[in-house]
């Protein structure tokens, strides 16, 4: 598993060992959106760790916006790209192997990484140990109840776990966090939970109704239902629009930094 995620996963998923300028543009737009999601919880100078930092776009954007951000990324080539092409502190390694003193971070983010780990609770508990009391953890994962993807694509080959909102919140409580809010993306495909690191979280709550709801959602999401909805027909146009937007964002740029700086400038976020 470790060999796969340190050297093979990105090639399988993205088709290359380092991100293209177009992929950097997409990740950069995503990083700006993630900053907007984080902004209500941030204070100037916060120490932020992006666990599963990919090519370092989130770390770069946050540092440009005045935060003390760093990252941890298991893929050797992507972590090296972040350090060399973007000049940001992204260490190569797995959360389960890394060590930081208690209270090292005010904020930890984990975007589409928790579903890839063998023991999600152990990972969140480890992150909690590195965080300041009342620090903020933001986790984004695919939504197992999503109806916007084809039934045959619900369970990704590289995902160890799948999450509903209730399960994600219970997992956070078990690891030493108290849920602040959980939201679903507009298309229903992703869940985002914001947690606060606390000394004594409420005990996890397990509701049989959650099992029944998730089970019904998975069983009920048939090919007939999916192809009778708008998702399979609007999806290709959405992907084409995203592709064109990414190409335009990267147009005229020669380096990853130029792509991200252009996006930050156009975002009109106050630096």
Regions found by a protein language model. Name each.
Residues 118-122, 149:
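Short N-terminal helix/helix-N-cap motif within the alpha/beta-hydrolase-1
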Residues 112-116:
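A short His-aromatic
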Residues 74, 141-143, 163, 180-182, ...:
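Catalytic cores of nucleotide-enabled group-transfer and carboxylate-activating enzymes in metabolic
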Residues 139-173:
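Short, glycine-/aromatic-enriched active-site segment of Class I SAM-dependent methyltransferases
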Residues 1-103, 107-111, 121, 204-271:
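Conserved N-terminal segment of class I S-adenosyl-L-methionine
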Residues 175, 184-219:
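Core SAM-dependent methyltransferase catalytic element
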Residues 121-136:
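A short glycine-rich, Lys/Arg-flanked "PGG" loop and its adjoining helix->strand segment in the class I
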């Amino acid at each position: 598993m470790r060999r796969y995620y340190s050297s093979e996963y990105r090639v399988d998923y993205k088709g290359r060992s380092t991100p293209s300028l177009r992929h950097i543009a997409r990740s950069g737009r995503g990083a700006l959106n993630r900053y907007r999601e984080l902004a209500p919880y941030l204070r100037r100078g916060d120490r932020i760790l992006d666990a599963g930092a990919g090519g370092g776009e989130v770390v770069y954007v946050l540092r440009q916006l005045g935060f003390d951000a760093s990252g941890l990324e298991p893929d050797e080539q992507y972590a090296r790209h972040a350090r060399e092409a973007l000049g940001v502190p992204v260490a190569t390694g797995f959360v389960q192997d890394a060590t930081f003193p208690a209270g090292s971070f005010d904020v930890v983010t984990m975007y589409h990484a928790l579903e890839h780990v063998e023991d999600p609770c152990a990972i969140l508990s480890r992150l909690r140990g590195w965080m300041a009391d009342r620090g903020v953890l933001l986790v984004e994962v695919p939504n197992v109840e999503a109806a916007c993807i084809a039934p045959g694509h619900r369970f990704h080959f590289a995902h160890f776990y799948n999450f509903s909102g209730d399960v994600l919140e219970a997992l956070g409580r078990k690891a030493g966090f108290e849920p602040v809010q959980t939201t679903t993306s507009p298309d229903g495909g992703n869940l985002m939970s914001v947690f606060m690191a606390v000394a004594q979280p409420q005990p996890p709550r397990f509701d049989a109704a959650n099992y029944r709801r998730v089970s019904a959602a998975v069983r009920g999401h048939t090919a007939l239902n999916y192809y009778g909805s708008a998702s399979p027909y609007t999806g290709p146009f959405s992907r084409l629009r995203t592709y064109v937007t990414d190409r335009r964002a990267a147009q005229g740029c020669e380096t990853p930094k130029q792509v991200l700086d252009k996006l930050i400038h156009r975002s009109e976020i106050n630096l």
